[in-house]
Structures are given as C-alpha cells and as structure tokens.
Amino acid sequence: MYIEMIDETGQVSQEIMEQTLDLLNFAAQKTGKEEKEMSVTFVTNERSHELNLEYRDTDRPTDVISLEYKPETPILFSQEDFAADPSLAEMMAEFDAYIGELFISIDKAREQSQEYGHSFEREMGFLAVHGFLHINGYDHYTLEEEKEMFTLQEEILTAYGLTRQ
C-alpha cells in the first residue's frame, strides 16, 4: 500500500510515523487492500477543529477525521479511448487505487491516551486503524455496523501487538 505521511505539527516522532505506516500496511494486508493508496496528516486540535467544522459541521476538535474518496461522477471511456491513449488505463488504475485521507489530531491522541490509561503509541495506532476502516467503507451508525467495525479494529490492533496495556 502506498501511504503519504504528512506531519503538519512538526511534533510527530520518526517512531510514530514508522509505526503508523507499518500498522496501516498491516491493516491493508488483513483487509485485502494492499494495492490501495491513501494519505495520513498529523494535525493540531486547532486544525482538527477547522476540518471538523468544514466537513462534519461540528464545532469542536476531534481525534480523527476520515475522508473516504468517492468520485462524484463516473468516468466512462470506450475501448477506442483506451486504444488511442494507453496512459488512460494507468491513470484509471491510480484513480481507483486512491481510497482517501486521514487527519489525526496528535493533541487529542495525547489527551485520550491519558484519559483511557494506555500509551500514546496505542492511541495513535487505534486512531489510524479506526480511520483506515472508515475510508474502506466501515462505519458504526448501527449496532450491527459497530460490532463488525470494532471487532475488526480490535483484531487488527491485537494481531499487530498494540493492546490496551
């Protein structure tokens, strides 16, 4: 999986960047998404607040914002189009590969790791996997969806070795 990592805060350690990259690749393997692409941006609470207001109409910071990429209009090409321009197939494959972007608030991750009594590394991993599942179509609006998503989330984190201790 190709993952672009961006640290807008300048506060994320190389270890956390590497853990996030490794964990998301592990999650992609577990869910059959190895050929996909995404981005992860680490932000402050202030930036998280702005994004939450813009995308979710919620006036407060949040821990992770997941923006699933869904083309708004289908792009249709004929066989003749592909024959005339061989680069179209490559472009469409790249287009299909991109699944979305995550914005993780490191401020919220620090707060929540203390609140829940586990490590900052565990919280960052939890938020990355939680967001990853969202941009892959998982949700928790109903009890059934919640059970499916949270079970998979915990399976990934446990198999990777990021437990609540």
Curated annotation (Swiss-Prot):
Zn(2+) binds at H130, H134, H140. It is found in: Cytoplasm. GO terms for molecular function: metalloendopeptidase activity; RNA endonuclease activity; zinc ion binding. Single strand-specific metallo-endoribonuclease involved in late-stage 70S ribosome quality control and in maturation of the 3' terminus of the 16S rRNA. Its EC number is 3.1.-.-. Binds 1 zinc ion. The keyword rRNA processing applies. It comes from the Bacteria. GO terms for cellular component: cytoplasm. Belongs to the endoribonuclease YbeY family. SUPFAM superfamilies: Metalloproteases ('zincins'), catalytic domain. The gene is ybeY. Its cofactor is Zn(2+). InterPro entries: MetalPrtase_cat_dom_sf_prd (IPR023091), YbeY (IPR002036), YbeY_CS (IPR020549). This is Endoribonuclease YbeY. One of its GO terms (biological process) is rRNA processing. NCBIfam families: rRNA maturation RNase YbeY. Keywords: Cytoplasm, Endonuclease, Hydrolase, Metal-binding, Nuclease, Ribosome biogenesis, rRNA processing, Zinc. The keyword Membrane does not apply.
